Amino acid sequence: MPLVRIGDRYVDVNIREELEEFEWENAKWTQEKLIASSPFRSSDRNPSFYIDLEGEYAGVFGDSGAYDTYYESGTLPKLLAYLRNESYEDAVDYLLSKYDYEYSNEDVILATPTPLDTSPRSHIMPEHLYAKPIDTEYLDGRGIHPKVVEMMGVFDNGNSIGIPWRDINGNVVAIKYRSKRDKTFYYEEGGAKLSELVYGLNIVVERGISRIAIVEAEIDAMTMMSTGVFAVAIGGARFNEHQADLIIASGVKEVILAGDNDLKGRQFNDKVAKMLRGYVELLTMDYSKYDGCKDVNELGTEGLRRVPLLNVDNKKDIRI
């Protein structure tokens, strides 16, 4: 395996194995390189993306057609952070914990956690980063109600929107920027890891909400909220014990599993169910009549109001 720089360490990484976890359009694999359509742009019909799999520049990627300079080039952690829908720091932790046997991250070791502890104060974002005009126009086009956008504090950031992530006490401890033009996103530097947070959970605690849906992405959560069902998001498809502890401690009684309508989404639902079973009542969305819909946002508010819910344990049809 090639030697790849991950954070401030060099480790042997099976780059091809990591990349084969994802679908690539117009992919051409060689021993040394992957050439494919850009994962950052759905409009890339002529492959403009490459990543070196071997050699001195193993793990380095480039995208000659990138709209955003942030994604013109970079290293494996940046690419995986995008593909896994997580922060750069979480991607680094993932790679080091998998490939560097000497690596130990104290932030990830959760010995008897106190679920409602706040994130470290050093992660609290300065107010000037997010005290900006609310952006309802972009998300209105995605079917999200303006009152939901305002409640979640989504703000205009020029060519992108800013999505604040708050800890259990409502402090903004991370900010995700999502491009208005394409699928790219990035995070404000110095923020907390999303693996330590649950998007929207502070409102669940503040308002004493007892019934929630769990989704992968923030926009899916806001879409669900626009139907009148509150939702929290994990920021990807990788649910962990710390996030489970936070949800259990929040006092919710009923959880709707609403991962994406694909294999990873079903695996996400299964993992959430495994960690929460016995603590809350579990329901799951029945996508059987909606095979063409990828996720909650694509299903839309009207579709969400019609989709059946099944009891996870006995598969009994539930009516809202």
Spans of model-derived segments:
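Small-residue helix-packing motif on alpha-helices
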Residues: 88-92, 149
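N-terminal single-stranded DNA-binding subdomain of primase/primase-helicase replication proteins
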Residues: 18-83, 155, 167, 284-286
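Conserved active-site segments centered on acidic
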Residues: 91-131
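Phosphate-handling DNA/RNA-contact segment within nucleic-acid enzymes
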Residues: 157-251
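Short, basic/aromatic recognition patches
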Residues: 141-158
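TOPRIM fold recognition
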Residues: 1-13, 60-62, 70-73, 185, ...
